[in-house]
Amino acid sequence: MASNQHSQRERTPDRSAQPPPPKMGRYFLDSESEEELEAVPLPPKKKVKKSMAAIPLSPESAEEEEAEPPRAVLGVMGFSMPPVRIMHHADGSQSFQKMETRQVHVLKASAQNSDENEKNVVVVRNPASQPLVSAWEKGMEAMAMLMEKYHVDHDERATFRFLPDQGSVYKKICTTWLNEEKRGLQLTFSSQKTFQELMGRFLQGYMQAYAGVQQNSWEPTGCCVWEHKCTEREGELRCLHGMEMVRKEHLVEMDVTSESGQRALKENPSKAKVAQNRWGRNVVQIKNDDARCCFHDVGCGNNSFSGKSCGLFYSEGMKAQIAFRQIEAFMLADYPHMRHGQKRLLMPVRCECLNKQDGLPRMGRQLCKITPFNLSNVDNIDINEVTDPGALASIKYPCLLVFQCANPVYRNARGNAGPNCDFKISAPDVMGALQLVRQLWGENFDGSPPRLVIPEFKWHQRLQYRNISLPTNHGDCREEPFDF
């Protein structure tokens, strides 16, 4: 056994140390030297194509198997011909991808569109470096300040949510401001309640404009700017349709013992007379030959309107035209440099009866009633002693336009009384309510008030006079209407 192992070791060659290979000699010709001999460049090596996906290593855990391979990210767009994409991979390597002609055209078109979009983009910055808030928060913050300053009840402040149907809060703010700043304010043919109501509506409109809130189906002021065209020609008036009103005869009969009858005898002794009506009762009759009505009401009797009428009627056309000229001169006194508002009238179109958000039409007129009122005891005022231009306008034209409830009900009136209210305000006081709200705003906020765009009046069929009311649904908690 030992001899066999010894013989096997002898046959195994020794691999421990091998002699180095012989050095290669370098020989030069007689005409050459080592310095003159140029090295021959080696041929370029082929670049390894890195576009091929590298073979991933075998994962060592289950988590590595489930992980998605990193995606390549477009880093640079080459300017070679043909163009190539240089893609950056997650492992730090790069790859090159050729682009087709169609892809190049798509990229050029998208780049042109992005340049055009950048030209139309408006960059909005916050110059005050203040946090941006929503319109609702902006309005709530301003109203919280006003409600606290003008002593609105705590319960109403807690329930206030800056909603369009919370107009009573604005009215209370204006009422407190009037009592503190404008005590003893004089109004002409206007009630304090209606004046405060309109101020609250204007304040609500300014607050919504300040906050940037706009209600598409609800206008808070309930007013319009009407281009009436009632002073362009002598004796010509226009109704709300924009058409010329028709002249007709109008006979008014009043009870002799009533307040209106006694006032008619005192103010119009030349026209009013006591006579017997067809039932043999003594009444005060006033016959007006200059009454004006809508052209749809030519065939209708007194206090009757057709289904297409606008509901506008003047018992004395000349008095109405004087009232329109009065408000023109009155506005020109306050705004002598105005260019667009002279022939326009700011008029409320929704009284308290119509100031509902349900959008349902009411019986009768759908707009406020417009009536010209005489200014008594103006003839004895000397114009040379008066310097106020607004007062001079009223002295020169002693009639005022008064806006009342759409369907007023008078005392001792016969028939069923429909929905009515005590809404009553004159045209100069409507402008006064707007001006006082601007003063209130200037006392509590810096800068000028926001733009309050009051809509311009345009006739629509939904404003026609309605002789029949829609059926009313009163509601019921039962599931079935009848018992079976």
UniProtKB/Swiss-Prot annotation:
Residues 1-69 are annotated as: Disordered. The modification Phosphotyrosine is found at Y150. InterPro entries: Ad_DBP_C_sf, ADBP_zn-bd_sf, Adenovirus_DNA-bd_a, Adenovirus_DNA-bd_N_sf, Adenovirus_DNA-bd_zn-bd, ADV_DNB2. Keywords: DNA replication, DNA-binding, Early protein, Host nucleus, Host-virus interaction, Metal-binding, Phosphoprotein, Viral DNA replication, Zinc. Zn(2+) 1 binds at C239, H241, C294, C310. The keyword Transcription regulation does not apply. GO terms for molecular function: DNA binding; zinc ion binding. It is found in: Host nucleus. The keyword Phosphoprotein applies. It holds the Pfam family Viral_DNA_bi. Disulfide bonds: none annotated. Residues 51-60 have a biased composition (Low complexity). One of its GO terms (cellular component) is host cell nucleus. Residues 252-286 are annotated as: Flexible loop. GO terms for biological process: DNA replication; DNA-templated transcription; positive regulation of DNA replication; viral DNA genome replication; viral DNA strand displacement replication. Residues 468-484 are annotated as: C-terminal arm, DBP binding. Transmembrane segments: none annotated. Belongs to the adenoviridae E2A DNA-binding protein family. Plays a role in the elongation phase of viral strand displacement replication by unwinding the template in an ATP-independent fashion, employing its capacity to form multimers. Also enhances the rate of initiation. Released from template upon second strand synthesis. Assembles in complex with viral pTP, viral pol, host NFIA and host POU2F1/OCT1 on viral origin of replication. Covers the whole ssDNA genome during synthesis. The complementary strand synthesis induces its relese from DNA template. May inhibit cellular transcription mediated by the interaction between host SRCAP and CBP. Homomultimerizes on viral ssDNA bound to pTP. Forms a initiation complex with viral polymerase, pTP and hosts NFIA and POU2F1/OCT1. Interacts with host SRCAP. The C-terminal arm bridges DBP molecules together, thereby creating a chain. This is DNA-binding protein. It comes from Human adenovirus A serotype 12. The gene is DBP.
